[in-house]
Amino acid sequence: APPEPVYPGDDATPEQMAEYVADLRRYINMLTRPRY
């Protein structure tokens, strides 16, 4: 599995937060994708 995205912190810029959320979604999708 890919490494879990690191939370950028409470003082992160909106761009950093958006990138983190996108990475987190991709990470969760990889974890929950069924493996046939």
Curated annotation (Swiss-Prot):
GO terms for cellular component: extracellular space. The modification Tyrosine amide is found at Y36. It comes from the Eukaryota. It is found in: Secreted. One of its GO terms (biological process) is neuropeptide signaling pathway. Signal peptide: none annotated. InterPro entries: Pancreatic_hormone-like (IPR001955), Pancreatic_hormone-like_CS (IPR020392). Pfam families: Hormone_3 (PF00159). Keywords: Amidation, Hormone, Secreted. GO terms for molecular function: neuropeptide hormone activity; neuropeptide Y receptor binding. Belongs to the NPY family. Hormone secreted by pancreatic cells that acts as a regulator of pancreatic and gastrointestinal functions probably by signaling through the G protein-coupled receptor NPY4R2. This is Pancreatic polypeptide. It comes from Oryctolagus cuniculus.
